[in-house]
A protein has these predicted regions:
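Active-site-proximal, substrate-binding regions of enzyme catalytic domains
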Residues: 1-57, 82-216, 222-373
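Charged, flexible boundary elements
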Residues: 60-81
């Protein structure tokens, strides 16, 4: 008989590992999951492919609110859609975006000034899962609650989940429009054998197919943002910036606290993580670099942070190395023609002014360019 051991400090994790251990596929489980995670990080599959049915809510909570590094669509991808938004636009929430805005509301009191749409199918699904989770243990949900990144409803995790799901339903009713799409319901009947996640997404995306209204999808699935480029879609970040700009920086901070990758970064986040790095303490400067690699709109925040830090330091050795890496990351996604542009020339001219710290920053950007082109 194969033994298993219970760690008194991590009882739930021990039981979860035991279940996997006794599974006939246990020898391949971790390898298969790691392959899926690698594919997800490369953008080859959506996060939903990492979720084990029927624990859909718990699966998204683990992705969004642990140290997993969930990847959101980079905000700059939405800019061309923003110009199409008008007073008649209606915004449709996908499940991960709904959970993200709900938990941000729990931490900050945020309420959307424009009520987004939640499909009636998604609303009823969440109400069903509220009951489902009373009788079924969700290890991913437990992990998210214990992470410390989201508001706690109760010290008892089981009670917390029940209270949280009740609050989620109430938040939807208070802050969203619950809309039924009859055309989508008709389509859904023909897709009864599809997975829960597939049917939820099909129903949500069907709003965008209608000709009678100006619908915009709010989606934080990076993969979907790539395959639906012809459809109007924005990220939660853009939605908050457009209609609750007073909450925008707090939302960016919240996403960074939750290890969500790809969102824009504030100058303060970059400064704080650099100071931790310089002090030799625990820091997330590598995550800052990873986010900036694919989010060039954070370049201004990097520039401002580097000038702020360089202007107050005498010994700039660590800073020069760190910000050379940051600038190189922010240049990666740009066309190399950028370095021949007037914008680049203006940057170098500005950093040549005899202002304290500018010479250090100029050295960083020129080193970054040299490394990138070598």
């Amino acid at each position: 008989m194969m033994p298993f051991f219970i760690d008194e400090n991590n009882i739930l994790e021990s039981f979860e590992n035991a279940i996997k251990q006794f599974s006939p596929e246990s020898c391949n489980y971790e390898e298969q999951r790691q392959k899926k995670i690698d594919d997800y990080k490369k953008g080859n599959i959506p996060y939903s492919h990492l979720i084990e049915i029927p624990d859909v809510i718990g699966g998204y909570y683990k992705g969004l609110f642990t140290s997993f590094e969930y990847k959101v669509p980079f905000a700059y991808l939405s800019f061309d859609i923003v110009s199409q938004i008008n007073d008649n636009s209606r915004f449709v929430l996908e499940l991960p975006s709904l959970l993200l805005l709900f938990e941000f509301s729990n931490k900050s009191g945020y309420n959307p000034k424009i009520k987004p749409i939640v499909s009636n199918v998604l609303y009823e699904y969440i109400k069903y899962k509220k009951t489902f989770l009373i009788y079924h243990v969700s290890f991913p949900f437990y992990e998210a609650i214990r992470s410390g990144y989201i508001y706690r409803y109760s010290e008892d995790v089981s009670e917390d989940i029940q209270l949280r799901m009740h609050a989620l339903v109430a938040w939807i009713e208070a802050n969203c429009q619950i809309v039924s799409n009859e055309e989508a319901l008709a389509i859904e009947e023909t897709r009864a054998n599809d997975s829960e996640l597939s049917r939820l997404f099909q129903h949500t995306i069907s709003f965008l197919m209608r000709k009678d209204a100006n619908y915009v999808l709010i989606s934080d699935e990076t993969y979907y943002s790539r395959i639906t480029q012809s459809l109007p879609a924005i990220s939660s970040e853009i939605f908050v910036k457009l209609f609750n700009e007073d909450s925008y920086k707090a939302f960016l901070n919240f996403m960074f606290e939750c290890h969500i990758c790809g969102a824009s970064l504030t100058e303060q986040i970059i400064v704080d993580e650099y100071k931790k790095l310089e002090a030799g303490g625990e820091n997330r400067f590598t995550e800052v670099i990873d986010s900036i690699k694919s989010n060039p709109i954070s370049f201004q925040a990097v520039l401002s942070a580097s000038i702020s830090l360089a202007s107050e330091k005498e010994d700039t050795g660590i800073l020069t190395n760190a910000f050379t890496d940051l600038f190189e990351s922010s240049f990666v996604i740009l066309d190399h023609e950028f370095f021949k542009s007037q914008e680049w020339q203006n940057l170098i001219i500005t950093l040549s002014f005899p202002i304290k710290g500018y010479d250090v920053v100029k050295k960083c950007v020129e080193n970054a360019k040299r490394k990138l082109l070598s």
